[in-house]
């Protein structure tokens, strides 16, 4: 269940970093550092370079986020 105060945006994975962390370029060309959500980790959903993903950003820190969905 999503929280009420998060900002959901779409982006494209441009770099894979250690510990399930990724650099994602948003549709407005900003680059955000993102981690995988717990449900995606639990269900072994893999993310590769170039994948389109949905992110959740908090209003407090717009340069870090959480990947919640990978588009097919």
Swiss-Prot record:
SMART domains: S1 (SM00316). Its main location: cytoplasm. It is found in: Cytoplasm. InterPro entries: NA-bd_OB-fold, RNA-binding_domain_S1_IF1, S1_domain, TIF_IF1. Residues 2-72 form the S1-like domain. GO terms for cellular component: cytosol. GO terms for molecular function: ribosome binding; rRNA binding; translation initiation factor activity. It comes from Helicobacter pylori (strain ATCC 700392 / 26695) (Campylobacter pylori). Keywords: Cytoplasm, Initiation factor, Protein biosynthesis, RNA-binding, rRNA-binding. One of the essential components for the initiation of protein synthesis. Stabilizes the binding of IF-2 and IF-3 on the 30S subunit to which N-formylmethionyl-tRNA(fMet) subsequently binds. Helps modulate mRNA selection, yielding the 30S pre-initiation complex (PIC). Upon addition of the 50S ribosomal subunit IF-1, IF-2 and IF-3 are released leaving the mature 70S translation initiation complex. This is Translation initiation factor IF-1. Component of the 30S ribosomal translation pre-initiation complex which assembles on the 30S ribosome in the order IF-2 and IF-3, IF-1 and N-formylmethionyl-tRNA(fMet); mRNA recruitment can occur at any time during PIC assembly. Belongs to the IF-1 family. It comes from the Bacteria.
